[in-house]
Design a protein with these regions (language model features):
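Ligand-binding clefts of soluble mixed alpha/beta catalytic domains
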Residues: 39, 51-580
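Well-ordered, non-membrane alpha-helical segments in soluble/globular domains
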Residues: 27-30, 443-444
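Polar/charged, Gly/Pro-rich intrinsically disordered segments
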Residues: 2-6, 11, 21-22, 29-42, ...
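Short, glycine-rich nucleotide/cofactor-binding loops
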Residues: 19-24, 396-398
């Protein structure tokens, strides 16, 4: 347009065309003036030129004046600074000796220099005679690995992170808001429990500490709850870690127990230190209450960052997909990894690394019930939960602790819409007097129940042995998997050949006097039985869906999970099951 007429502004700003006689200085002056007046970027074109002769950028910074900050605001900022300094300096000075960060420094590690996006309840207990910074408990929201999360963090410099009235109120509000937003919750725990001298008003009240665990229960399966322990969590404080979906302890600093060593000695006479009572080794190898142990605070954050890659924000969403990568090891080697001898051990991790995306297997509870592997992985970028028998431990037989571990993992995956991959190579549930005392039937029931109830897509692979009720627990044909496929090394039967022949033919074999003849007949019977349980026979009877070449297993699983991605399964109409 000629003579200073203006073209309509668009999202990129305003374009102005002036007469051809104007020079660059005039164009620049016009651009600056119009950008200031219109509060938008301006391009000025001279004559018929295609390129602007000058541009003006709008200055949208606030107009400076002399109205602030006031003394009132400066006083408030000073008060906030004092609160954020935490408890007494002497307690802060002790933290490095224990390998710990001050809680607000910890938040910077997790969320960057600005820490929390916003904080709630910072002034809790500000007016108390004995001022307690934020009542020793920080709550708010933050962005973590690109996601909005609710956050709770104890301040150990304030009464050793203990809990009392105002802090309890903050904790409860944070949980209740998580139910509304559907965002994950991070609990950064470092608490010695409830303040015994202040228990009136927060212990047994309707809105007291007991409500924590009510809210934990309501949040369970709704949004991921992740807990990291940075210190001793005793009594009531120890329940948050076990209610969380995932719990990480930090080596050398964290512990959890229903009572302190002093209380244990008073009640039972047992003299025990905190680490032996409830340290990381106890809870990752014996109780199963913790999933992982971090080397230090930085490692704890890294582990949680890895973990959330496999999880959705809530139960209404699917877990996020990532770009696919080839497996760490070649699928061509799968058949060579699985021994010809069905009784020879091998590492199932080697099979997993040849099936899932490169370096994507994230194992949980590796030291607890190690005869079953549980963990997340990506398969063609799709998150899956892996439940795999581990022949390198206890021949892959399922013991009570492993059954409980697998049940909990399957239940969690189903809650958060993570498909399940079962890799079966087990002689079945372990037998004997000790496992009966350890509740093998009860805990085996839980594993079978969790597998039965899962409505996410499931794929079962018979890698080698699938004996007894092991094939039930590992989502065999009767448990509504989308597919049951087998490798040529697979066998499906009530029991293995050795046990079966001994059970059925022991008396007849004993009647053969010649030892060589008896051994020969026993071997013949074993071979006949082995043919009966061979997966080709099972495929012939359409017990399983397919026998696949091992080198194609990854491709088979990628295609099957993709095809059944949107499968819908209904549970019978009922309030809930009775298995817990």
């Amino acid at each position: 347009m000629e003579n200073g007429l203006v073209a309509p502004a668009d999202v990129a700003g305003m374009k102005v065309r002036i007469g051809a006689e104007a020079n660059v200085e005039e164009a620049a002056a016009i651009a600056r003036a119009m950008a200031t007046h219109a509060e938008t970027d301006v391009e000025v074109y001279v004559g018929d030129d295609d390129e602007p002769a000058a541009t003006g950028e709008a200055d949208l910074s606030p107009v400076e004046d002399d109205l602030g900050p006031t003394d009132r605001e400066r006083d408030l900022l000073a008060q906030i600074e004092a609160i954020e300094a935490g408890g007494p300096e002497k307690y802060k000075e002790q933290l490095p000796e224990e390998g710990k960060r001050f809680v607000r420094d910890r938040l910077e590690l997790w969320f960057g220099a600005d820490g929390l996006t916003f904080e709630d309840g910072r002034f809790a207990e500000f007016d108390a005679d004995d001022e307690l910074a934020a009542d020793g408990l920080l709550t708010g929201a933050a962005e973590f690995e690109g996601r909005d999360v609710h956050v709770m963090a104890n301040d150990y410099t304030v009464k050793r992170g203990s809990m009392a009235g105002k802090g309890v109120e903050k904790f409860l509000r944070m949980q209740q808001r998580a139910l509304k937003t559907g965002s994950p919750v991070l609990y950064l725990m470092d608490s010695s429990g409830g303040r015994i001298d202040q228990q009136t008003g927060f212990f047994a009240n309707r809105e007291g500490i007991g409500k924590y665990y009510y809210n934990h229960s309501r949040l369970s399966g709704r949004v991921p709850q992740i807990c990291v322990l940075y210190g001793p969590c005793i009594a009531g404080a120890a329940y948050t870690p076990v209610f969380a979906d995932f719990t990480i302890m930090v080596e050398g600093m964290s512990a959890m127990a229903i009572a302190s060593p002093r209380m244990v000695e008073m009640v039972t006479g047992e003299d025990i230190d905190l680490d032996a009572l409830g340290g990381p080794e106890v809870h990752t190898t014996e109780s199963g209450s913790a999933d992982l142990v971090a080397r230090d605070e930085e490692h704890a954050r890294e582990l949680v960052a890895q973990l959330v890659r496999y999880l959705p924000d809530n139960s209404d969403e699917r877990p996020p997909r990532t770009a696919t990568t080839p497996p760490t090891r070649s699928p061509e080697g799968i058949d060579a990894v699985v021994p010809q001898d069905p009784n020879e051990g091998y590492d199932m991790q080697d099979v997993i690394e040849r099936v899932v995306d490169r370096h994507s297997f994230f194992e949980l509870q590796p030291e607890y019930g190690p005869e079953i592997l549980t963990g997340f992985a990506h398969l063609d970028g799709r998150p899956v939960g892996v439940i795999a028998n581990q022949p390198a431990h206890r021949a892959g037989a399922i013991f009570p602790d492993a059954a409980e571990k697998a049940a909990q993992f399957a239940w969690t995956c189903d809650a958060y819409n993570v498909p399940l991959l079962y890799l079966c190579d087990t002689p079945g549930f372990m037998a004997g007097s000790q496992v009966e005392k350890d509740a093998i039937l009860e805990k085996g029931k839980k594993m079978i129940y969790a597998t039965s109830e899962a409505t996410v897509p499931k794929q079962c692979v018979v890698v080698r042995k699938a004996y007894g009720a092991g094939i039930y627990a590992m989502s065999g044909p009767a448990y509504d998997p989308e597919s049951t496929i087998a490798l040529p090394s697979g066998e499906i039967g009530i029991m293995g050949p050795e046990a079966a022949i001994n059970a059925v033919y022991a008396r007849k074999l004993a009647e053969i006097d010649d030892a060589d003849e008896r051994a020969e007949r026993e071997q013949e019977l074993r071979e006949e039985y082995r043919e009966d349980i061979d997966v080709r026979r099972m495929a012939s009877e359409v017990v399983i869906d397919e026998v696949v070449p091992p080198s194609t297993l990854r491709d088979q699983l990628v295609d099957r999970f993709a095809f059944y991605e949107d499968v819908e399964k209904d549970r019978p109409s009922k309030k809930h099951g009775t298995v817990l």
